[in-house]
Regions:
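Active-site-proximal alpha-helical scaffold in enzymes
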Residues: 89-99, 148-151, 156-159, 164-197, ...
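Acyl-CoA/ACP chain-elongation machinery
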Residues: 190-212, 217-229, 262-276, 306-313, ...
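ACP-dependent fatty acid/polyketide chain-elongation machinery
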Residues: 1-78, 100, 246-258, 353-368, ...
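Glycine-/small-residue-rich "gating" segment that lines the acyl/pantetheine channel
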Residues: 133-139, 180, 184, 201-250, ...
Length: 413
């Protein structure tokens, strides 16, 4: 169940974060998002990106993209043709890159998580193919753009590096899996630094699909509420720059935090429903903490996956209760999806950046909208703006098909 990553032939290296970028419906950039998450602001509104007149649900967390993107190596003509997800990805990557102080270097690996090219690539391909099936002139462009790694290639070209690309499409755990894989590359000496994160954009196909599954809530989602009615979709991107502690210290970098544990597991129970006992979720939390060398008693906050669907939240509650043991009654937990919705492949990365914010700025993100706590939760939910001493954070990401991942982060002192 729990995947045992191979041990390095030498002592594992410490991996630190030196840059972070984030784009959500709260805004673009660390500061606006930190303020929004700290205050528990909700960014839901009626959908304007596509027609939802035939859908049961009409709201989502849409991103307001700026009129211009930051300067890159991409020619203006190519920038004009970029899809929505790539634009968000470039904004987040530019912020992380600028903050890190990294200099141009061709040999930097890129590891990204997304749900099949942010889903929008497939939708665009099929839409245009149906509308103009005989247009051979456009067929080559369609095929080239219909690739899950298309957005990763755009990032490489934008920043001028040609390191190896890895694109992970593992449902809603994709962003966390990407960061975990990047962490393993650096930790075990396969890379000195890696650019990593996740991204996804809203699209009509996925919106209609979730609505047909009766998984969407007609009102803003309420994770862990006893009367929750489903998730609310969002979109966004988040990027981290990871490097060895030694490399960061040698160049005098500002260290934002440290990743000290990661684990991934699959329960193979059902296509859309998690295992009722939360076995894989329990395994990832236990495994990640074991690798980190900590116990639940040393964890100060859990950023839950918390989608607000009946099955997911109940299962995650069971898993957290099992994992935390006697610590559970006083362990602060919240789901930031109550603010920006479920960003799918970007979720694990977005929530990793939010977790980093709590470590850097010493507050816990409240969960707006909660009315009655589900009795399955043995832990308290953060409901209002809270200052706290945060040293270690656990961030969970769980996806369809039983894909589970947990990241453990520590404050840098």
């Amino acid at each position: 169940m729990l995947f045992p990553f191979p041990n390095s032939p030498s002592k594992p290296r410490r991996v630190v974060i030196t840059g972070a970028g984030i784009v959500t419906a709260l805004g673009s950039g660390w500061r606006v998002n930190a303020v929004g998450f700290r205050e528990g602001r909700q960014a839901f509104r009626p959908v304007t990106l596509f027609d939802v007149s035939r859908q049961r649900v009409k709201i989502a967390a849409e991103v307001d993209l700026p009129a211009e993107l930051p300067p890159t190596k991409l020619p203006a003509r190519r920038v004009a043709r970029l899809d929505r997800a790539t634009k968000m990805l470039l904004l987040a990557a530019h912020e992380a890159w600028s903050q890190s102080g990294w200099q141009a270097d061709a040999n930097i690996p890129l590891v990204l998580g997304t749900t099949g090219g942010a889903m929008s690539l497939g939708e665009n391909y099929l839409t245009h193919a149906i509308r103009s099936p005989q247009s051979q002139r456009l067929q080559a462009t369609r095929v080239v753009n219909y690739q899950p790694q298309r957005q990763a290639l755009d990032v490489c070209d934008a920043f001028g590096f040609s390191g190896p690309i890895t694109t992970i499409a593992n449902a809603c755990a994709s962003g966390a899996n990407a960061i975990g894989h990047a962490w393993e590359l650096v930790r075990h000496g396969r890379a000195t630094r890696v650019l990593t994160g996740g991204h996804d954009s809203l699209c009509q196909l996925i919106f209609a699909g979730f609505d047909s599954l009766q998984a969407l809530s007609p009102s803003p989602c309420r994770p862990f509420d006893a009367q929750r009615t489903g998730l609310t979709l969002g979109e966004g991107a988040a990027i981290l720059t990871l490097e060895t502690l030694e490399h960061a210290q040698q160049r005098g970098a500002i260290i934002l935090g440290e990743i000290i544990g990661y684990a991934a597991a699959t329960d193979i129970h059902h296509l859309t429903q998690p295992h009722p006992e939360g076995n894989a979720a329990f395994a990832t939390m236990t495994g990640a903490c074991k690798i980190a060398g900590i116990t639940p008693n040393q964890v100060d906050y859990v950023n839950a996956h918390g989608t607000a669907t009946p099955h997911n939240d109940s299962t995650e509650a069971v898993a957290i209760n099992r994992w935390a043991g006697t610590r559970v009654a006083t362990l602060p937990v919240s789901s930031t999806k109550a603010c920006v919705g479920h960003t799918l492949g970007a979720a694990g990365a977005v929530e990793a950046v939010v977790s980093l914010m709590t470590l850097r700025e010493q507050w816990l993100p409240p969960e707006p909208g909660l009315v009655v706590l589900d009795p399955a939760c043995g832990f308290p939910i953060v409901r209002e703006r809270t200052d706290a001493c945060v040293r270690v954070v656990v961030s969970n990401s769980f996806g369809f098909g039983g894909a589970n991942a947990t990241i453990v982060m520590r404050r840098w002192m």
